[in-house]
Amino acid sequence: MSEEDTRLTARSGYQPQFSWSYLQPKYWLIWLGIFGLILLAFVPFRLRDKLASYIGKIVARKAQKQRHRAKINLQYCFPHWTEAQREQTIEEMFVIVTQVMLGIGEIAIRSKRHLQRRSCFTGLEHIHRAREQGKNIILLVPHAWAIDASGIILHTHGMPMTSMYNPHRNPLVDWLWTFARQRFGGKMHARQNGIKPFLNHVKQGDMGYYLPDEDYGAELSVFVDFFATYKATLPGINKIARLAKAAVIPMFPRYNALSGKYEIEIHPAMTLSDDPEQAARAMNQEIESFVTATPAQYVWILRLLKTRKDGTDIYA
């Protein structure tokens, strides 16, 4: 990205452009996949989810690296679980992610009204209350499988979002998915531009989408409790909230295959300590509260516990 492009995206949001090179043969398989997702967008969810369940069980057997990471994470976070409990959660997780992925076309192209019918909220009053108090809003959103879908759905309910984003390595996928994320007015910001563009849009009234559970290493993090273990956690949420003059409201999206709906649970605004470690621990407590109820909805395949105090690689 050129310096001029960097300045542009810092002001207006990340905006990759279409290139005629995307029609070259090397991209044809991606276009074929996109066509398949578009077709699935109009298939009844029960039929689509049945297909996804079948595929997800196959993926669960084939994706050994991802399965290994999930197993390690669950062993550390839930040492009291039996091996059977961990295996069942992993199997359910792969089914859920496949259901969400096969439904991406629906999220990307169907109408506002359709997406509104396919979603429901609990705790929406916490957002309304913060607005009534004149506060900006930062949503604290752990890595659930339905995280992208919920961001787009919020737009359809008149709640514009802004978020930071790592551009996809494949430029065609990057262009397509950014277009889908922003089609109702959302703003994505490339992480290389820093946090300032994100904060500026929060101050202008967009709700910030903040992911609290990524591991950025020991130098940028503090070690605080996370389930039954500990985690390198970014400590700056209290400072970010202060700079944005925002309430920090935890939110967790789930996909319910029984109803075919995206269920978005919202908690009351957090009371954040001025102490960075206490604020970081409070974030992890919110994650624990959401995930414990439905562990298979969480993205356990991430290297969530990558940074350890003794420098060991638990995923090796």
Language model region names:
Residues S2-V141, D174-L176, G185:
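Membrane-anchoring hydrophobic helices of lipid-metabolizing enzymes
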Residues C120, H189, H267:
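General small-molecule cofactor/ligand-binding pocket signal
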Residues Q99, Q133-Q192, A218-D225, T229, ...:
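Catalytic core of membrane glycerolipid acyltransferases/transacylases, capturing the structured
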Residues F35, R69, E125, A149, ...:
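Short Gly/charged-rich anion-binding patches and loops
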Residues S2-L8, Y14-Q17, Q24, Q88, ...:
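Non-catalytic C-terminal accessory region of glycerolipid acyltransferases
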